């Protein structure tokens, strides 16, 4: 059950504190009950001599209370000046009591040294700061663990089993363990007693070391406050013989302790886990084999300091010095490169200055071109007359802007100078070309329009169905996108007619100065940059909103014999249909198997463009046909297939839009 408690504690506390609980739980489930102090001694005990010695010791401790534990430990060291004298002596109760008084001094010395060596590691940043978020162990060692390991088996305190009992599998994974501060309070050594649980007239004794320690830690760059009482208790003894077996065995100062922890505060970044820690830590003990010679009596950190300096500090300092030299060399290289670049820049500036007069006229021509890209009339006029077009590379003896070759060249020039404005003027051409073709009074008139035939590459024998599908939006009834079944059903089950488009309207929001509404990526479109699978690719290729709408007057009468199977087709309808085409740059995601975003001038003199398109068809007035429209999704039909999203050629629309314009007078 205690094992389950430990597991539950690790699950309940924050991720960083789970490993820290190794400090306060043991690696064994053996329950060892602590003794309670007793001020009364059964005078009929068989260990009267030991009881008397104990009373004398405690009375003496009370009388000599001003005598600090540090002083008592100093007296012990004066009495036993070297390890030889220790191994050839027999300790008394007073000796052990005085020896254990050195725990606080040794802990203080050890923690101070840990903090000092931590500072040495930190001082490496003064040589050259580290740029690593998680430096390797050799550059950021766990100093407490390292110094403790240097002392060898039996040294207290360490992080592992012979110390705070933090399991190796846990503390070895700490990438940043640091003691920022500590305080040791309420230090006390006592000789406690309890009645034997079997022979009630017999008293057992044990030495108990108790103190409070408040640690301010940094673990994996997170602040941890750990305030707890720590109790170390020796084996019990009931007489002088037991005492000698425990404390006078050789080699000297090899004692066994049982430890217990009472947590006052355990918090991680302000998250308090004290209560649950104490609930689950009750009855948890740890057995320590402590070598008090190396831990207290002959604590010597000089060798550890020298070894740590050799293995960690000096190599780290050398690394930082080398890093600093490399950085300085890189700075010199950068400075030299900057000097070379400055010289090159000066040369270029000189050349630019020499040709500034020549370029001034070109710049003026570019400014005039940008202004001309504001509408189709000024665009047409710019490339139909004047010298500005010549300065920018448009040869009027070779090109005519009202031909495909000429318009393609004009768009190449404008695209190389003003990509967004070229995008805008091509959208205007699409808009005005669409309005122009939709306003034709009858489909035959559109088919027979020579300018339309030239712009879209059609012949005089083009059918109404072909004509309706060659443009986006398409002309008339055949230009409405619907399923083949619905088009067949309307022709087979009903008598259905629709007029040519009327009340044509078009709206393009914003212009090239308004990047919120008109914008195109400066890059060539690539998968996983301008387009791809997911919401984050919306608007990455281009942004615009264009709507084109018109009305179709119509009549529908279903044949009488179709009533049983014509579905949502109404028996009769007469009224208007409002057809709206909404276009924007939110091309459907790549996973929908649509043509990805595209805006490019091709070798066959086309400007291919893929818009996102939604067709909405709704009834105006008589809404009895709306059920059919909704059932076929014609009220909100989004183009989502390779065929439906094939690129359109914006040059075709622009050619048709400017086909009847006249050049300005010279």
From Swiss-Prot:
Specify one Pfam family: DUF237
Give the protein family.
Belongs to the MG032/MG096/MG288 family.
Protein's recorded name: Uncharacterized protein MG032
Organismal lineage: Bacteria, Bacillati, Mycoplasmatota, Mycoplasmoidales, Mycoplasmoidaceae
């Amino acid at each position: 059950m205690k094992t389950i408690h430990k597991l539950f504690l690790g699950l309940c506390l924050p991720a960083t504190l789970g490993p820290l609980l190794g400090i306060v739980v043991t690696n064994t489930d053996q329950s060892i009950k602590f003794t309670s102090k007793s001020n009364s001694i059964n005078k009929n005990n068989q260990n009267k001599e030991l009881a008397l010695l104990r009373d004398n010791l405690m009375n003496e401790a009370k009388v000599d209370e001003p005598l600090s534990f540090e002083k008592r430990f100093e007296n012990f060291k004066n009495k036993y000046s070297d390890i030889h004298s220790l191994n050839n002596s027999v300790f008394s109760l007073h000796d052990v009591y005085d020896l254990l008084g050195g725990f606080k001094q040794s802990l203080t010395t050890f923690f101070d040294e840990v903090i000092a060596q931590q500072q040495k590691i930190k001082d490496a940043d003064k040589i050259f700061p580290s740029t690593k978020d998680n430096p390797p162990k050799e550059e950021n060692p766990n100093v407490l663990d390292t110094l403790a390991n240097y002392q060898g088996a039996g040294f207290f305190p360490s992080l592992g089993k012979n110390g705070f009992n933090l399991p190796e599998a846990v503390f070895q994974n700490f990438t940043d363990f640091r003691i920022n501060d500590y305080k040791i309070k309420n230090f006390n050594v006592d000789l406690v007693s309890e009645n034997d649980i079997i022979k009630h007239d017999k008293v057992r004794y044990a030495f108990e070391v108790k103190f409070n320690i408040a640690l301010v830690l940094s673990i994996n760059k997170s602040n941890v406050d750990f305030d707890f009482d720590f109790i170390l208790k020796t084996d019990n003894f009931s007489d002088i013989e037991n005492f000698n077996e425990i404390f006078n065995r050789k080699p000297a100062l090899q004692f066994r302790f049982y430890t217990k922890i009472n947590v006052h505060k355990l918090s991680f970044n302000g998250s308090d886990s004290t209560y649950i820690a104490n609930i689950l830590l009750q009855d948890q003990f740890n057995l320590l084999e402590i070598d008090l010679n190396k831990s207290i009596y002959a604590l010597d950190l000089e060798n550890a300091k020298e070894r740590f300096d050799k293995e960690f500090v000096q190599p780290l300092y050398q690394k930082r010095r080398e890093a600093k030299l490399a950085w300085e060399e890189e700075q010199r290289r950068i400075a030299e490169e900057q000097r070379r670049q400055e010289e090159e820049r000066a040369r270029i500036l000189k050349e630019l200055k020499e040709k500034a007069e020549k370029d001034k006229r070109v710049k003026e021509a570019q400014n005039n071109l940008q202004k001309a890209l504001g509408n189709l009339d000024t665009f047409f006029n710019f490339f139909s007359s004047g010298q500005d077009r010549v300065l920018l590379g448009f040869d009027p003896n070779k090109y005519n802007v009202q031909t495909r070759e000429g318009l393609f060249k004009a768009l190449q020039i404008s695209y190389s100078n003003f990509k967004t404005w070229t995008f805008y003027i091509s959208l205007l051409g699409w808009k005005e070309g669409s309005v122009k073709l939709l306003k034709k009074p009858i489909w035959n008139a559109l088919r027979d329009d020579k300018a339309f035939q030239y712009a879209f590459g059609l012949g005089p024998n083009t059918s109404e169905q072909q004509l309706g599908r060659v443009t986006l939006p398409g002309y008339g009834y055949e230009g409405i996108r619907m399923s083949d079944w619905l088009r067949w059903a309307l022709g087979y089950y009903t008598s259905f007619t629709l007029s040519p488009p009327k009340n044509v309207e078009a709206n393009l929001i914003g212009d090239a100065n308004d990047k919120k509404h008109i914008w195109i990526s400066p890059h060539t479109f690539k998968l996983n940059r301008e387009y791809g699978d997911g919401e984050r690719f919306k608007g990455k290729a281009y942004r615009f909103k264009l709507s084109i709408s018109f009305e179709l007057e119509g009549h529908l009468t279903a044949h009488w014999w179709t009533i049983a199977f014509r579905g949502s087709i109404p028996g009769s309808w007469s009224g208007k249909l409002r057809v709206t085409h909404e276009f924007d740059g939110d091309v459907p995601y790549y996973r929908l198997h649509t043509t990805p975003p595209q805006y490019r001038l091709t070798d066959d003199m086309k400007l291919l463009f893929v818009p996102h398109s939604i067709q909405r068809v709704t009834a105006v007035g008589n809404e009895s046909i709306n059920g059919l429209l909704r059932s076929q999704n014609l009220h909100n039909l989004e183009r989502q297939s390779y065929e439906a999203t094939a690129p359109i050629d914006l040059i075709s629309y622009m050619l048709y839009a400017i086909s009847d314009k006249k050049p300005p007078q010279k």
